[in-house]
Amino acid sequence: MEAFQRRTYKSFGEFWGDIQHLLSRRLKTKQAMDGELISEAFRERLMNVVTEVNDCRYCRSFHLSQASRAGISKEELMKLTSGLISEDTPEDEIPALLYAQHWAEQNAQPDEKPVQELKEHYSEPEVEAIHIILRMIRSGNLIGNTFDYLLYKLSFGRWGQSPMKKPEL
């Protein structure tokens, strides 16, 4: 049986830590999601970048449709789902998207230099909103991947291993 490749929660404590982090910041979470600090399209770009790194099939499907609804072009979405930043991406969002990719690749433990660069490009409330959005999508990704891992184990490797083919845009 081939080993399960995607990132999952390794313990209930890790899962609970993420949930507590988000619950303790409910007001800031609401502000991050209301579209005033971070536009809906920007939020969906961030979520799709993290989802691409973590490879969650459930989040990919949902957030591609949300990104389409937010007005992101099919061409840009194709690039995002390939781990690339499109030339159609608003220039002021690129630093955050590159940071989000690094953040996800480092399993939410970014190096200090990219954190400082993020703070140079965005206000403190925007940086907080970006981090909350990244934490939310990471939690969703790991929940989805952990569910797939359970399917994989229960089915002796028949289900849950490979993410679904990337949706046609």
Which role fits each region the language model picked out?
Residues 1-169:
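Hydrophobic alpha-helical segments
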